[in-house]
Amino acid sequence: MAGQGSQMKKYCDCCKRYVDHSNGKMKCFHRQMSANFEHSMIIPNKFLDQFGGKISRTVELESPKGNVYVVKVSKHMNKTVLQCGWEAFVDAHQIEENDSLLFRHIKNSRRASGVQERNADPIDVSSSTHDDTVQSSGGERFARSESGSDSQHSKTAKLAATCSSGGSECTGEEAKESSSSEHESSYDLVDPQIAPMPGYVLSRGTNLSQAHEEKLDMLVQEIRPEIPLYVTTMKHSNVNSHHASLVIAKHYACAYFPHTSQTITLKWHGKNRKWHPKFYIRKDQVGYILHGRWIDFVRHNHVKEGDICIFHLKNFNGRKFRATVHLLRETIPHSFGALHIPKRFESRNGRMRLKMTDDRRVSSTECRRGTMEPSTTNVKKEADNEQCNNGQGKRQEPLNFDVSVGSSKPYLTADRVSLTEEQFMKVEENVHSIQSEGPIYVSIMNKSNVGTDGLYIITLGRQFAIRYLPEGEQTLTLLTTGTGKAWQVKMRPRSGDARMFTLGWRDFVRDNRLQTEDICLFQLTKNSERGLAMKVHIIRHNERS
């Protein structure tokens, strides 16, 4: 790039303008926004040294117009992270991947400001270093933030980060060091296996289905681990040999496991019993292995190949190393046969049919006295990874509802969901009585939906979501018939264009006393006063006749 040398000199001069040699502490730092930067940003530990290694729980970022962005500070993987609220700040300033931010601590004002540059172009000093600082309430001071552009390829902005004590700025070398040695700007860090959302680390070769990912996300929210969870899929060598062992990923073991070979303590979630496998570190420091009584842990808890073990580590005090293990069982698509359920309705190719033990079709006389033909009922199947055991659903064409076909209004169910004859009749009856102008989504409550296994998650499938639900995170109002009560539920996108209910869904479940095998009919309604809303019709499993 022409003039790159002179522009880089301006960049260095910008940093040197804030030099404070009194204590040699980092007074500013530089960050280049990498993948997933919009979710979080890490503050270098050296920058925190000037505040005694600590910073307040929240920081405020203030714009030139006086808009204040409150950002939560949290600890993950021994890193201090700007998280909740950071995304709003990023959006407001139109920060993009590969933009660079220079954060500085402003002398005598307890402020930290930053300069943004597009595509790592040098900073325009003249438009990014003037003192535009303000006093803020609460005893902390911040710099204002502004953005502008002087060319098609560069953009400058003054950003802010909270500081809790006085001080001044940094040298150009410090800014450069913070960019190179602590360049992680998001949870990608150095290892691509570290999840974009904080809370867990996947071992190499571990791939989560959407259902497992949702359960894992909910587990992280429930226990809020101080140390990221370690998630690994069981292989044959881990569970099927008298000499079974488990290798812990090196980057994780080095960071969180003991630094010497020793016996550790494992607990099974929900049990008081303890197991004491040996944690062994090879002399060449390339292998970190659980063995010995590891096989006892596997056998006593019936851990199988394909299961996913989640290690929740406790803070290591140097003497006893402890971890609690949660398990996600390998899920296999159900095969409904004569030994379990002799007669069920299945969704196939957009039609419903009755599945018998010999897999024969039945005539309409075998259903509701000949008043209905199951093979022509207008029910569409829907890919719903949360309901589908293996987390996979086939891609489907856009739905075409034709209310003239069959005896009921159209509705959607999860792909591979199986309704008993009793369930099918009850759903048909309720859908017919609702007379909805809009689509209805049918979901049979399982343990994860109603909190039986400690989780409260529910997913609406892809086809329903992409056709009828807005993109992005939304606040949804859930209503029930006859109560007049409303619940505000957060709905966020999942992989594969599905949608998941998060905050607020637990309250809905508890207030309505939902149980496994209850059926919920989600009716999308037009309610301008409440915005996006659904009326939920509940069919109790113990009330079906």
Curated annotation (Swiss-Prot):
Q: What is its main location?
A: nucleus
Q: Where is the composition biased (Basic and acidic residues)?
A: 173-186
Which GO cellular component terms, listed alphabetically, does the Swiss-Prot or TrEMBL entry include?
nucleus
Q: Does the keyword Glycoprotein apply?
A: no
- DNA-binding region(s), residue ranges: 26-119, 231-331, 441-542
User: Could you tell me which PANTHER family the record lists for this protein?
Assistant: B3 DOMAIN-CONTAINING PROTEIN OS03G0620500, B3 DOMAIN-CONTAINING PROTEIN OS11G0197600-RELATED
Protein name, as recorded = B3 domain-containing protein Os03g0620500
Organism source for this protein? Oryza sativa subsp. japonica (Rice)
